[in-house]
C-alpha cells in the first residue's frame, strides 16, 4: 500500500467512526430549505424550521398537548379502533395496513380528541394524524369527531379541530363516505346550540375531509403554505390540461380568494385561538391583549 492510499484509508475510517458515534434521530433536514437541523431544537419550535419558517407536519398528540394547558388534557374516545368489516384487500389487506399504521404511530386511528383548557377556558380539541394512513377518514375517525362535538355541546364549550388528511379512507368504501354526512350533521347541531367550532386547516387538507367538516368552521384558519382543496393540483392539471396559477390551493391563495378567514403561524396558534374563542363565546379574554398594554403605556407617557 502506498503512502497516499494509507492517508485516504485513514480518513475514511475516522469519518466512519465519527458517524457511528452519532445516535440515530439526532439530526433531521428541513423539507423546504433542506438545512440540517437539530431534532430537539425543531421539536421545541413545534416542527417549524427555525431557519426558513417552513411548517412541517407535526404529530397529532404533540399538537394537542402543545395547545392545551399543561396537565389539563383528558383524551376522549380512546378505546375506539378500526375494524376490517368489508375484508378489503388492495395490494395489502386492510387489517394489515391498520396494524402497520398502529405500530408506526402508536395510535389506534388517524384522529385524536381531548377535553381540556386553553388559558383556563374549557375546550374540546381534535387533531388528525397524517402519519396514520394519510390521516384518512374512516368510521372510527368519524365517530371520534362526532363524540368530540357531542362533548362540546354537553359542556357548552368551543370545539377546535386541526385537519391533516388525504380524504375519505377508500378501504372502507361507503362507510367512509357516510362520515362526511355524519360530521356535517353534528356541526349543524352545534350551530343550532350556539356552540363555536373552529376549523384549523393544516398541510394537507384534501378530499372528503375538505368537502365536509374541515370547511364548516364558524372561523376557518389555516397554517402558512398549507395545501387545501378537494383534488390535488397534479390531478387537476391532468384533468383540465392547463397549468395552474402559482401557489394554487395554498392557504395564501385561498385567503386572497376569501375561502378561509385567516392564516396563523403555529407559534401564534394558542394565543389567536384563545382570542377568537373568547369573542365567539362572548366571554372576557383570558389574558391581556398585547396591543392594549402598548396603548395603555403610550397613554401614560403622553399624559406625562
Swiss-Prot record:
Pathway: Lipid metabolism; malonyl-CoA biosynthesis; malonyl-CoA from acetyl-CoA: step 1/1. It comes from the Bacteria. Zn(2+) binds at residues 30, 33, 49, 52. Its EC number is 2.1.3.15. It is an enzyme of class 2 (transferase). It catalyses: N(6)-carboxybiotinyl-L-lysyl-[protein] + acetyl-CoA = N(6)-biotinyl-L-lysyl-[protein] + malonyl-CoA. Gene3D superfamilies: 2-enoyl-CoA Hydratase, Chain A, domain 1. The keyword Ribosomal protein does not apply. GO terms for biological process: fatty acid biosynthetic process; malonyl-CoA biosynthetic process. GO terms for molecular function: acetyl-CoA carboxylase activity; ATP binding; carboxyl- or carbamoyltransferase activity; zinc ion binding. The keyword ATP-binding applies. It is found in: Cytoplasm. InterPro entries: AcCoA_carboxyl_beta (IPR034733), Acetyl_CoA_COase_Trfase_b_su (IPR000438), ClpP/crotonase-like_dom_sf (IPR029045), COA_CT_N (IPR011762), Znf-ACC (IPR041010). Binds 1 zinc ion per subunit. Its main location: cytoplasm. Acetyl-CoA carboxylase is a heterohexamer composed of biotin carboxyl carrier protein (AccB), biotin carboxylase (AccC) and two subunits each of ACCase subunit alpha (AccA) and ACCase subunit beta (AccD). HAMAP family: AcetylCoA_CT_beta. Belongs to the AccD/PCCB family. This is Acetyl-coenzyme A carboxylase carboxyl transferase subunit beta. The gene is accD.
Amino acid at each position: 500500500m502506498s503512502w497516499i492510499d494509507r492517508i485516504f484509508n485513514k480518513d475514511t475510517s475516522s469519518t466512519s467512526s465519527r458517524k457511528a458515534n452519532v445516535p440515530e434521530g439526532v439530526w433531521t433536514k428541513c423539507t423546504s430549505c433542506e438545512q440540517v437541523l437539530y431534532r430537539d431544537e425543531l421539536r421545541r419550535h413545534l416542527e417549524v424550521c427555525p431557519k426558513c419558517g417552513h411548517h412541517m407536519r407535526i404529530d397529532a398528540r404533540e399538537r394537542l398537548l402543545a395547545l392545551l394547558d399543561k396537565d389539563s388534557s383528558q383524551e376522549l374516545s380512546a378505546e375506539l379502533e378500526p375494524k376490517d368489516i368489508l375484508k378489503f384487500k388492495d395490494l395489502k389487506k386492510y387489517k394489515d395496513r391498520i396494524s402497520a399504521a398502529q405500530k408506526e404511530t402508536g395510535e389506534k386511528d388517524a384522529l385524536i380528541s381531548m377535553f381540556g383548557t386553553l388559558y383556563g377556558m374549557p375546550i374540546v380539541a381534535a387533531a388528525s394524524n397524517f402519519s396514520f394512513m394519510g390521516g384518512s377518514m374512516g368510521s372510527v375517525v368519524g365517530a371520534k369527531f362526532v363524540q368530540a362535538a357531542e362533548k362540546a355541546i354537553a359542556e357548552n364549550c368551543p370545539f377546535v379541530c386541526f385537519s391533516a388528511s388525504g380524504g375519505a379512507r377508500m378501504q372502507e368504501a361507503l362507510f367512509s363516505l357516510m362520515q362526511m354526512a355524519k360530521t356535517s350533521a353534528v356541526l349543524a347541531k352545534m350551530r343550532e346550540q350556539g356552540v363555536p367550532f373552529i376549523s384549523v386547516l393544516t398541510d394537507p387538507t384534501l378530499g372528503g375531509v375538505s368537502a365536509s367538516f374541515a370547511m364548516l368552521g364558524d372561523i376557518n384558519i389555516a397554517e402558512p403554505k398549507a395545501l387545501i382543496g378537494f383534488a390535488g393540483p397534479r390531478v387537476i392539471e391532468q384533468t383540465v390540461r392547463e397549468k395552474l396559477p402559482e401557489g394554487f390551493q395554498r392557504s395564501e391563495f385561498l385567503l386572497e380568494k376569501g375561502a378561509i378567514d385567516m392564516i396563523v403561524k403555529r407559534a401564534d396558534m394558542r394565543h389567536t385561538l384563545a382570542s377568537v374563542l373568547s369573542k365567539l363565546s362572548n366571554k372576557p379574554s383570558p389574558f391581556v391583549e398585547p396591543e392594549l398594554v402598548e396603548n395603555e403605556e403610550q397613554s401614560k407617557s403622553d399624559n406625562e
